[in-house]
Amino acid sequence: MRFTNPLLFPPPVPPEPPDRNSPVTPPRGPVPVPLPPGKGRHGGLDGGRRGSPEGQEDEEDSDEEEAENYPPSRSRPRRGRRRLHNKWDQNINYEPPAAPEDDWEDFCKKLTIPQFLF
């Protein structure tokens, strides 16, 4: 059982229920702005981002045309999540060079470890 001093740590007081006679306070935060009828959040009759009129296709919408806009020396920006580069990926099949096979006593002499510890 944990000792707690009631003078230093008073027991928690439950919150009082809201009074039914008090006026309701509006929630804090940004006030939503009503949109005009027929308009989406980004403009346009169809509610699209670019705001193009209905039935017309924008010239830059297709990926093929977008790829032609970039020179061949510079690739177009990728869409979607890019793979994170890990520095260990390039050496995933790396094997350390094989150690020369010495007998145990020579190994101990090289490391200056007393032999009686083994």
UniProtKB/Swiss-Prot annotation:
Biased region (Basic residues) positions are 75-85
Region spans: Disordered: 1-103
User: Which keywords are on file for this protein?
Assistant: Early protein
Q: Compositional bias of type Basic and acidic residues: which residue ranges?
A: 43-52
Question: Is this entry keyworded Coiled coil?
Answer: no
Ranges of compositional bias, category Acidic residues = 55-68
Q: Where is the composition biased (Pro residues)?
A: 24-37
Question: Which family is this sequence assigned to?
Answer: Belongs to the papillomaviridae E4 protein family.
Protein's name according to its UniProt entry: Probable protein E4
Q: Which organism is it from?
A: Canine oral papillomavirus (strain Y62) (COPV)
Q: Which gene encodes it?
A: E4
